[in-house]
A protein has these predicted regions:
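Betabetaalpha-Me/HNH-type nuclease active-site subdomain
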Residues: 10-129, 134-138
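Exposed alpha-helical structural elements
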Residues: 2-3, 36, 40, 155, ...
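C-terminal, well-folded lobe of enzymatic/effector domains
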Residues: 136-193
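Short helix-coil boundary/hinge micro-motifs
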Residues: 1-6, 10-12
């Protein structure tokens, strides 16, 4: 609750984000092709394998939003485990826990391009998620969307607060009240910012 009380409560801007101006950065840890997406997939999955280019090829994700297990295979749609029929995302998308458009409306638009790109690629902001759940979440706040996995709701609220605190992003009153309501049911939750 202490970190939540430090967030500015206000009215968010109604500007369109520049999300399409950003892409996953190359991360030099594995190879020249290893991106932020690979870093997050490797962090969040078990039994990870890599292709010859250094990208994550496969793995198993205990998906936090739904609580389901997803068998990731790069380049496959994986519709049976919640993948997008039209995408070849392996059933997993990398979600900005505070959606980029929501962050942009909450103050990210005041930061320069490099700072926004840092946000876009910050592993602390990103989570491997079921494509279907991420597509339903879109750019909603915790008022509009919560994980169906009850066991993850405290973590989700804490992540939202920590990310907003780290980047100096505001919340509106409804969002503040919903975060406080969720946190009241999990008083031992630690918020990392």
């Amino acid at each position: 609750m202490q970190v939540l009380s430090t967030l500015t409560v206000g009215t968010k801007s109604n500007v369109s984000s520049d999300r399409k101006s950003h892409q996953w950065n190359k991360v030099d840890e594995k190879s020249g092709n290893y991106t932020t997406r690979d870093l997050v997939l490797e962090r969040d999955m078990n039994n990870v394998t890599f292709n010859s280019r250094g990208n994550v090829k496969s793995g198993i994700l205990l998906e936090p939003y739904t609580g389901k297990t997803i068998h990731f295979q790069r380049g496959q749609s994986n519709k049976t485990e919640g993948g997008s029929a039209s995408n070849r995302d392996g059933g997993i998308q990398i979600d900005h826990v505070v959606a980029y458009a929501e962050a942009y409306r909450s103050g990210l638009d005041k930061l320069d391009f490099q700072q926004r790109d840092t946000y876009y690629n910050d592993p602390d902001v990103l989570l491997s998620s079921q494509a279907e759940a991420n597509n339903v979440k879109k750019d909603g706040t915790i008022v509009e969307w919560e994980p169906s996995n009850q066991a993850f709701q405290c973590d989700y609220a804490s992540l939202q607060i920590g990310i907003k605190a780290k980047y100096g992003l505001m919340v509106d009153q409804k969002e503040h009240d919903k975060l406080a309501q969720v946190l009241a049911s999990c008083p031992t939750e630690t918020i990392i910012s």
